[in-house]
């Protein structure tokens, strides 16, 4: 079970991604001893979304260079979140779809038991639709993985 109801790593990632005022959510994240970062990405290509999130994770110290398990956990969390955003069909451009997303990454130890280790959550929130202005709709995705 989670340390405390307000310390759920996925919930915090979602709140951070959808928040118009992320400072409030970031304060809760800091009090939970988690790391977090936010960013934006827009593309018709899934690989560019993955690359943008990976770059933010490396730049903010979420994953260490040369530590395979950290990068692997991040990739799984990103792909799981993309499945939510794209309703299971991760292709974008080949289906004439584009996304404009805010993303949040949260890393930490959400469980009381130390042996449960660290986890990483990636939340994506924004719009998806045809590459025609005004033809998109809201979408959200969440991926959580252990490190």
Swiss-Prot record:
This is Hut operon positive regulatory protein. The keyword Isomerase does not apply. HAMAP family: HutP. Antiterminator that binds to cis-acting regulatory sequences on the mRNA in the presence of histidine, thereby suppressing transcription termination and activating the hut operon for histidine utilization. One of its GO terms (biological process) is positive regulation of gene expression. Homohexamer. Pfam families: HutP (PF09021). It comes from Halalkalibacterium halodurans (strain ATCC BAA-125 / DSM 18197 / FERM 7344 / JCM 9153 / C-125). The keyword RNA-binding applies. One of its GO terms (molecular function) is mRNA binding. Belongs to the HutP family. Keywords: Activator, Histidine metabolism, RNA-binding, Transcription, Transcription regulation. InterPro entries: Regulatory_HutP, Regulatory_HutP_bacillales, Regulatory_HutP_sf.
């Amino acid at each position: 079970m989670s340390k405390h109801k307000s310390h759920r790593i996925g919930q915090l990632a979602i709140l951070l991604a959808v928040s118009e005022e992320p400072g409030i959510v970031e304060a809760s994240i800091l009090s939970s001893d988690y790391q977090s970062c936010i960013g934006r990405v827009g593309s018709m290509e899934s690989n560019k979304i993955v690359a943008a999130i990976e770059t933010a994770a490396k730049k903010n110290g979420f994953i260490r260079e040369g530590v395979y398990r950290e990068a692997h956990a991040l990739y799984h969390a990103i792909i799981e979140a993309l499945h939510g955003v794209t309703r299971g069909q991760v292709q974008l451009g080949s289906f004439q779809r584009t996304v404009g997303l805010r993303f949040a990454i949260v890393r930490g130890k959400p469980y009381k038991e130390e042996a449960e280790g660290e986890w990483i959550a990636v939340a994506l929130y924004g719009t998806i639709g045809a590459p025609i202005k005004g033809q998109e709709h809201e979408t959200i995705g969440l991926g959580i993985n252990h490190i």
